[in-house]
Amino acid sequence: MNRLNFQSLLWKFGQKRFYYRPWIRIENIKPTPLWKPITFAVGVGSATFYTANYLDKRRKNYPKSSYGFPIPQTSSRSLVLSIIGINVGVFALWRAPRFSHLNRFLQKYAVMNPIFINMPSMIVSAFSHQSGWHLLFNMVAFYSFAPAIVDVFGNNQFVAFYISSILFSNVASLLHHRLRFGTKVTPGSLGASGAIYAIAAATSYFFPNASVSIIFLPFIPIKIGVALLGLMAFDAWGLISRGFSSFANFTLIDHAAHLGGGIFGWLYAKYGYSTYNRSTRPRPPSLSKPFFSRSVSF
Protein backbone atom coordinates (compact mmCIF):
# COMPACT_ATOMS: atom_id res chain seq x y z
CA MET A 1 0.00 0.00 0.00
CA ASN A 2 1.65 3.21 -1.14
CA ARG A 3 0.83 6.85 -0.60
CA LEU A 4 -0.24 8.88 -3.62
CA ASN A 5 -0.38 12.59 -4.41
CA PHE A 6 -3.68 14.12 -3.34
CA GLN A 7 -4.71 15.29 -6.80
CA SER A 8 -8.31 14.29 -6.20
CA LEU A 9 -8.55 16.63 -3.21
CA LEU A 10 -7.64 19.64 -5.33
CA TRP A 11 -10.29 18.70 -7.86
CA LYS A 12 -12.87 19.07 -5.10
CA PHE A 13 -12.10 22.80 -5.15
CA GLY A 14 -12.23 23.17 -8.94
CA GLN A 15 -8.48 23.41 -9.47
CA LYS A 16 -7.43 23.23 -13.12
CA ARG A 17 -3.76 22.45 -12.39
CA PHE A 18 -1.96 20.32 -9.85
CA TYR A 19 0.26 22.00 -7.26
CA TYR A 20 2.02 19.89 -4.67
CA ARG A 21 1.83 21.07 -1.09
CA PRO A 22 3.30 18.68 1.51
CA TRP A 23 0.94 19.83 4.27
CA ILE A 24 -2.36 21.67 3.89
CA ARG A 25 -5.04 22.12 6.53
CA ILE A 26 -8.60 22.44 5.33
CA GLU A 27 -10.67 24.58 7.67
CA ASN A 28 -14.00 24.95 5.87
CA ILE A 29 -14.68 21.33 4.96
CA LYS A 30 -15.28 18.73 7.62
CA PRO A 31 -13.36 15.46 7.25
CA THR A 32 -15.28 12.21 7.04
CA PRO A 33 -15.91 10.91 10.58
CA LEU A 34 -14.10 7.67 11.33
CA TRP A 35 -17.23 5.79 12.35
CA LYS A 36 -18.36 5.75 8.71
CA PRO A 37 -15.39 3.81 7.24
CA ILE A 38 -15.29 1.54 10.30
CA THR A 39 -19.00 0.75 9.94
CA PHE A 40 -18.54 0.22 6.21
CA ALA A 41 -15.63 -2.16 6.80
CA VAL A 42 -17.48 -4.19 9.42
CA GLY A 43 -20.65 -4.34 7.34
CA VAL A 44 -19.02 -5.31 4.05
CA GLY A 45 -16.61 -7.74 5.72
CA SER A 46 -19.47 -9.44 7.56
CA ALA A 47 -21.54 -9.60 4.38
CA THR A 48 -18.72 -11.23 2.40
CA PHE A 49 -18.17 -13.88 5.06
CA TYR A 50 -21.91 -14.51 5.36
CA THR A 51 -22.16 -14.97 1.59
CA ALA A 52 -19.10 -17.23 1.49
CA ASN A 53 -20.47 -19.25 4.39
CA TYR A 54 -23.81 -19.70 2.62
CA LEU A 55 -22.15 -20.81 -0.62
CA ASP A 56 -19.85 -23.25 1.15
CA LYS A 57 -22.73 -24.71 3.16
CA ARG A 58 -24.70 -25.18 -0.02
CA ARG A 59 -21.77 -26.91 -1.70
CA LYS A 60 -21.15 -29.27 1.24
CA ASN A 61 -24.78 -30.09 1.97
CA TYR A 62 -25.91 -30.25 -1.66
CA PRO A 63 -22.86 -31.31 -3.70
CA LYS A 64 -24.99 -31.55 -6.85
CA SER A 65 -27.31 -29.08 -8.48
CA SER A 66 -31.02 -29.71 -8.96
CA TYR A 67 -30.20 -31.16 -12.39
CA GLY A 68 -27.83 -33.75 -10.93
CA PHE A 69 -24.61 -32.09 -12.07
CA PRO A 70 -21.82 -31.14 -9.62
CA ILE A 71 -21.89 -27.48 -8.61
CA PRO A 72 -18.95 -25.95 -10.53
CA GLN A 73 -16.11 -24.24 -8.67
CA THR A 74 -13.31 -22.14 -10.11
CA SER A 75 -9.82 -23.56 -9.61
CA SER A 76 -7.46 -21.79 -7.23
CA ARG A 77 -5.13 -20.88 -10.09
CA SER A 78 -7.97 -19.31 -12.07
CA LEU A 79 -9.07 -17.28 -9.06
CA VAL A 80 -5.55 -15.99 -8.41
CA LEU A 81 -5.02 -15.10 -12.07
CA SER A 82 -8.41 -13.35 -12.17
CA ILE A 83 -7.43 -11.09 -9.27
CA ILE A 84 -4.09 -10.36 -10.93
CA GLY A 85 -5.96 -9.58 -14.15
CA ILE A 86 -8.17 -7.04 -12.34
CA ASN A 87 -5.05 -5.30 -10.97
CA VAL A 88 -3.45 -5.22 -14.40
CA GLY A 89 -6.67 -3.86 -15.91
CA VAL A 90 -6.89 -1.00 -13.40
CA PHE A 91 -3.20 -0.24 -13.99
CA ALA A 92 -3.95 0.02 -17.71
CA LEU A 93 -6.77 2.47 -16.99
CA TRP A 94 -4.30 4.71 -15.15
CA ARG A 95 -2.54 5.24 -18.50
CA ALA A 96 -5.40 7.56 -19.47
CA PRO A 97 -4.38 11.21 -20.00
CA ARG A 98 -4.07 13.26 -16.84
CA PHE A 99 -7.13 15.31 -15.92
CA SER A 100 -9.31 13.27 -18.31
CA HIS A 101 -12.71 12.08 -17.09
CA LEU A 102 -11.38 8.54 -16.64
CA ASN A 103 -8.40 9.79 -14.65
CA ARG A 104 -10.66 11.86 -12.43
CA PHE A 105 -12.89 8.84 -11.89
CA LEU A 106 -9.87 6.78 -10.82
CA GLN A 107 -8.65 9.54 -8.52
CA LYS A 108 -12.03 9.47 -6.82
CA TYR A 109 -12.62 5.73 -6.53
CA ALA A 110 -9.21 4.05 -6.95
CA VAL A 111 -7.31 6.12 -4.36
CA MET A 112 -8.24 6.19 -0.68
CA ASN A 113 -8.18 9.77 0.57
CA PRO A 114 -7.49 9.73 4.35
CA ILE A 115 -9.50 12.91 5.02
CA PHE A 116 -12.47 12.86 2.63
CA ILE A 117 -13.10 9.13 2.52
CA ASN A 118 -15.01 7.66 -0.40
CA MET A 119 -16.27 4.30 0.88
CA PRO A 120 -15.91 2.28 -2.36
CA SER A 121 -12.30 3.46 -2.58
CA MET A 122 -11.53 1.44 0.56
CA ILE A 123 -11.85 -1.68 -1.61
CA VAL A 124 -11.06 -0.45 -5.13
CA SER A 125 -7.78 1.18 -4.04
CA ALA A 126 -6.37 -2.27 -3.23
CA PHE A 127 -6.70 -3.23 -6.91
CA SER A 128 -5.10 0.01 -8.06
CA HIS A 129 -1.43 0.66 -8.91
CA GLN A 130 0.00 3.65 -10.74
CA SER A 131 3.62 2.49 -10.86
CA GLY A 132 4.62 -0.51 -12.96
CA TRP A 133 7.22 -1.58 -10.38
CA HIS A 134 4.65 -1.32 -7.58
CA LEU A 135 2.27 -3.54 -9.56
CA LEU A 136 5.02 -6.02 -10.45
CA PHE A 137 6.31 -6.48 -6.90
CA ASN A 138 2.82 -6.83 -5.44
CA MET A 139 1.57 -9.28 -8.05
CA VAL A 140 4.71 -11.45 -7.84
CA ALA A 141 4.24 -11.63 -4.06
CA PHE A 142 0.52 -12.31 -4.47
CA TYR A 143 1.12 -15.10 -6.98
CA SER A 144 3.76 -16.61 -4.67
CA PHE A 145 1.57 -16.82 -1.56
CA ALA A 146 -2.07 -16.79 -2.66
CA PRO A 147 -2.44 -20.23 -4.35
CA ALA A 148 -1.49 -22.12 -1.17
CA ILE A 149 -3.95 -20.12 0.93
CA VAL A 150 -6.72 -20.56 -1.65
CA ASP A 151 -6.17 -24.32 -1.39
CA VAL A 152 -6.44 -24.10 2.41
CA PHE A 153 -9.45 -21.79 2.57
CA GLY A 154 -11.31 -22.64 -0.60
CA ASN A 155 -12.39 -20.04 -3.13
CA ASN A 156 -15.34 -18.55 -1.27
CA GLN A 157 -13.61 -18.19 2.07
CA PHE A 158 -10.49 -16.78 0.39
CA VAL A 159 -12.46 -14.05 -1.39
CA ALA A 160 -14.11 -13.06 1.90
CA PHE A 161 -10.72 -13.16 3.64
CA TYR A 162 -9.08 -11.07 0.91
CA ILE A 163 -11.75 -8.35 0.88
CA SER A 164 -11.84 -8.23 4.69
CA SER A 165 -8.04 -7.94 4.87
CA ILE A 166 -8.23 -5.01 2.43
CA LEU A 167 -10.80 -3.28 4.63
CA PHE A 168 -8.97 -4.01 7.90
CA SER A 169 -5.64 -2.74 6.57
CA ASN A 170 -7.27 0.44 5.26
CA VAL A 171 -9.03 1.06 8.57
CA ALA A 172 -5.64 0.69 10.31
CA SER A 173 -4.21 3.25 7.88
CA LEU A 174 -7.05 5.69 8.53
CA LEU A 175 -6.81 5.33 12.31
CA HIS A 176 -3.07 5.97 12.23
CA HIS A 177 -3.52 9.01 10.02
CA ARG A 178 -6.15 10.61 12.25
CA LEU A 179 -4.22 9.88 15.45
CA ARG A 180 -0.90 11.04 14.02
CA PHE A 181 -1.77 13.86 11.65
CA GLY A 182 -5.32 14.87 12.54
CA THR A 183 -6.95 16.79 9.70
CA LYS A 184 -3.74 17.53 7.84
CA VAL A 185 -3.94 16.45 4.24
CA THR A 186 -1.44 13.77 3.28
CA PRO A 187 -1.14 11.74 0.07
CA GLY A 188 -3.84 9.15 -0.54
CA SER A 189 -3.04 5.45 -0.54
CA LEU A 190 -3.43 2.63 -3.05
CA GLY A 191 -2.07 -0.84 -3.73
CA ALA A 192 -2.57 -4.44 -2.60
CA SER A 193 0.29 -4.56 -0.08
CA GLY A 194 -1.93 -4.65 3.02
CA ALA A 195 -3.90 -7.64 1.74
CA ILE A 196 -0.68 -9.37 0.63
CA TYR A 197 0.70 -8.98 4.16
CA ALA A 198 -2.45 -10.72 5.41
CA ILE A 199 -1.94 -13.60 2.96
CA ALA A 200 1.74 -13.87 3.92
CA ALA A 201 0.81 -13.94 7.62
CA ALA A 202 -1.74 -16.70 7.03
CA THR A 203 0.87 -18.62 5.02
CA SER A 204 3.37 -18.34 7.87
CA TYR A 205 0.76 -19.76 10.26
CA PHE A 206 -0.29 -22.73 8.12
CA PHE A 207 3.15 -23.43 6.63
CA PRO A 208 5.66 -22.40 9.32
CA ASN A 209 8.49 -24.40 7.73
CA ALA A 210 8.15 -22.75 4.32
CA SER A 211 11.08 -20.64 3.16
CA VAL A 212 11.17 -17.53 0.99
CA SER A 213 13.91 -15.62 -0.79
CA ILE A 214 14.20 -11.86 -0.55
CA ILE A 215 14.74 -10.11 -3.87
CA PHE A 216 18.04 -8.61 -2.69
CA LEU A 217 19.25 -11.99 -1.34
CA PRO A 218 17.83 -14.45 -3.88
CA PHE A 219 20.12 -17.36 -2.95
CA ILE A 220 19.56 -17.25 0.82
CA PRO A 221 16.33 -19.00 1.93
CA ILE A 222 14.66 -17.48 4.98
CA LYS A 223 11.83 -18.96 7.04
CA ILE A 224 8.65 -17.19 6.08
CA GLY A 225 7.85 -16.31 9.70
CA VAL A 226 11.26 -14.69 10.18
CA ALA A 227 10.95 -12.76 6.91
CA LEU A 228 7.47 -11.55 7.84
CA LEU A 229 8.57 -10.43 11.31
CA GLY A 230 11.49 -8.58 9.74
CA LEU A 231 9.21 -6.75 7.32
CA MET A 232 6.73 -5.88 10.07
CA ALA A 233 9.58 -4.63 12.27
CA PHE A 234 10.64 -2.37 9.40
CA ASP A 235 7.06 -1.12 9.08
CA ALA A 236 6.87 -0.48 12.82
CA TRP A 237 10.10 1.52 12.60
CA GLY A 238 8.75 3.47 9.64
CA LEU A 239 5.53 4.18 11.51
CA ILE A 240 7.36 5.53 14.55
CA SER A 241 10.13 7.39 12.74
CA ARG A 242 7.98 9.18 10.16
CA GLY A 243 8.51 12.86 10.76
CA PHE A 244 11.93 12.24 12.32
CA SER A 245 13.71 10.21 9.62
CA SER A 246 14.28 11.61 6.13
CA PHE A 247 14.25 8.06 4.72
CA ALA A 248 10.88 7.24 6.31
CA ASN A 249 9.45 10.49 4.95
CA PHE A 250 10.87 9.88 1.49
CA THR A 251 9.50 6.35 0.97
CA LEU A 252 5.82 7.30 1.47
CA ILE A 253 5.00 3.68 2.34
CA ASP A 254 1.73 3.10 4.16
CA HIS A 255 3.28 1.20 7.06
CA ALA A 256 0.05 1.19 9.09
CA ALA A 257 -1.79 -0.67 6.32
CA HIS A 258 0.98 -3.28 6.16
CA LEU A 259 0.88 -3.86 9.91
CA GLY A 260 -2.92 -3.96 9.95
CA GLY A 261 -2.99 -6.51 7.15
CA GLY A 262 -0.36 -8.71 8.78
CA ILE A 263 -2.14 -8.69 12.14
CA PHE A 264 -5.51 -9.46 10.55
CA GLY A 265 -4.08 -12.34 8.50
CA TRP A 266 -2.44 -14.01 11.48
CA LEU A 267 -5.47 -13.59 13.77
CA TYR A 268 -7.82 -14.97 11.15
CA ALA A 269 -5.59 -17.96 10.46
CA LYS A 270 -5.40 -18.75 14.17
CA TYR A 271 -9.01 -18.11 15.21
CA GLY A 272 -11.25 -17.29 12.27
CA TYR A 273 -10.42 -20.26 10.03
CA SER A 274 -11.52 -22.92 12.54
CA THR A 275 -14.64 -20.95 13.43
CA TYR A 276 -15.59 -20.62 9.77
CA ASN A 277 -15.09 -24.33 9.11
CA ARG A 278 -17.22 -25.34 12.09
CA SER A 279 -20.06 -23.22 10.75
CA THR A 280 -19.94 -24.87 7.31
CA ARG A 281 -19.88 -28.52 8.39
CA PRO A 282 -22.32 -30.69 6.43
CA ARG A 283 -25.56 -31.51 8.19
CA PRO A 284 -26.07 -35.10 9.37
CA PRO A 285 -27.72 -37.33 6.74
CA SER A 286 -30.84 -37.67 8.86
CA LEU A 287 -31.34 -33.91 8.69
CA SER A 288 -30.45 -33.43 5.05
CA LYS A 289 -34.05 -34.20 3.95
CA PRO A 290 -37.21 -32.56 5.22
CA PHE A 291 -39.27 -34.56 7.72
CA PHE A 292 -42.27 -35.03 5.44
CA SER A 293 -40.13 -36.80 2.82
CA ARG A 294 -39.13 -39.65 5.15
CA SER A 295 -41.01 -42.95 4.92
CA VAL A 296 -42.93 -43.74 8.09
CA SER A 297 -44.31 -47.22 8.81
CA PHE A 298 -46.87 -48.17 11.46
From Swiss-Prot:
The organism's place on the tree of life at top rank: Eukaryota
Cross-referenced InterPro entries: Peptidase_S54_rhomboid_dom, Rhomboid-like_sf, Rhomboid_protease_S54
Gene Ontology molecular function: serine-type endopeptidase activity
Parts of the chain that traverse the membrane: 32-52, 74-94, 109-129, 133-153, 157-177, 188-208, 214-234, 247-267
Membrane topology: Multi-pass membrane protein
Compartments in which it is found: Membrane
Biological processes annotated in GO: mitochondrial protein processing; signal peptide processing
Cystine residue pairs: none
Statement: the UniProt record of this protein carries the keyword Iron-sulfur: no
Coiled coil region boundaries: none
Keyword field: Membrane, Transmembrane, Transmembrane helix
Annotated Gene Ontology cellular component terms: membrane; mitochondrion
Family label: To yeast YGR101w.
Name listed for the protein in its UniProt record: Uncharacterized protein C13E7.11
Source organism phylogeny: Eukaryota, Fungi, Dikarya, Ascomycota, Taphrinomycotina
